[in-house]
């Protein structure tokens, strides 16, 4: 380190990732897994983005709190995030809800998911806690947020971004002054307030918070003792600090990581089937808004050992081909054609099948002579020969989960019911 250059604050921080939510708006896609464990981008899980941001920012102490159907998530974390070494002052802890405070008490809210593990946090003695939601897709340098937190002497610093006012009721909405001190904070209001001078925009919380550890622990004890609290950061902790302390907003534009191919700040909630489908399909664009090829800010994940993707057959109507598509390792495209499609590991697509605008999760098998358009196919689903989806909205809605925008979610139980 050169003389006069301060050491990164991330060295003294611990990232605490909240990854216990179901994500019920993803419908059957989260029947078997928590939302942070949902697949994204061909190889990754959604949680890999928050974890990779922490790692790339220089944070070497990470904890992940899990609750809802956590097996898939825990297995992924054990396989893909097992490279932290205590001898280098690194740690990676998985913290399932385990009735640590009371025999009849699981995590009661996001704040309680931290409160029940205060002893683990204290054992590492970090100076700062970077509290993260494990279910968003974005690239962000948390070091810059830590710097603002210290420079402004905040009790809490809240990551924020502008969204359309029509969408803001799904988030915590804030109002800030000229120095970005938060003057009001409303969690998921029915009528979100607009930003000054921007009647169609609202400033919303990203679910990312920076605290001094000592202050956070004091607030968690205070909140835990309040019988009227729902023990949630957005509903209880943050509004209290806004009224009684100093809460500062950190604008995502200041710390968003962009490669040379990215010209906008990319952040997605992917909380609905339509949003999930669109965010994955966007990656098939010639220049996608999210650059997964950025070697300076890699998205770390578990890399399953697979052979290369394989394309076979070269006859008219039976040509193994893919255009504007992402095809992961272990896939075999046997006489099928793909357009604007994303295949995860180990997918097989058989002869005379045409697939367009599809997100197909690992080890699904697509039969012969199928036509699939605008679909999400869950992992390990077996699509029977000749199935047509995406051409008859009424029939699709009877057989599968069809979204408002016409995306069809296909799971194995839905396929099994076709024969009954």
UniProtKB/Swiss-Prot annotation:
It is an enzyme of class 2 (transferase). GO terms for biological process: glycogen biosynthetic process. InterPro entries: ADP-Glc_PPase (IPR011831), ADP_Glu_pyroP_CS (IPR005836), GlgC_bac (IPR023049), GlmU/GlgC-like_hexapep (IPR056818), NTP_transferase_dom (IPR005835), Nucleotide-diphossugar_trans (IPR029044), Trimer_LpxA-like_sf (IPR011004). Keywords: ATP-binding, Carbohydrate metabolism, Glycogen biosynthesis, Glycogen metabolism, Nucleotide-binding, Nucleotidyltransferase, Transferase. It catalyses: alpha-D-glucose 1-phosphate + ATP + H(+) = ADP-alpha-D-glucose + diphosphate. PROSITE patterns: ADP_GLC_PYROPHOSPH_1 (PS00808), ADP_GLC_PYROPHOSPH_2 (PS00809), ADP_GLC_PYROPHOSPH_3 (PS00810). Its EC number is 2.7.7.27. Coiled coil: none annotated. Pfam families: Hexapep_GlmU, NTP_transferase. Pathway: Glycan biosynthesis; glycogen biosynthesis. Alpha-D-glucose 1-phosphate binds at residues 107, 172, 187-188, 205. GO terms for molecular function: ATP binding; glucose-1-phosphate adenylyltransferase activity. Involved in the biosynthesis of ADP-glucose, a building block required for the elongation reactions to produce glycogen. Catalyzes the reaction between ATP and alpha-D-glucose 1-phosphate (G1P) to produce pyrophosphate and ADP-Glc. PANTHER family: GLUCOSE-1-PHOSPHATE ADENYLYLTRANSFERASE (PTHR43523:SF2), GLUCOSE-1-PHOSPHATE ADENYLYLTRANSFERASE-RELATED (PTHR43523). Homotetramer. Belongs to the bacterial/plant glucose-1-phosphate adenylyltransferase family. This is Glucose-1-phosphate adenylyltransferase. It comes from Rhodopseudomonas palustris (strain BisB5).
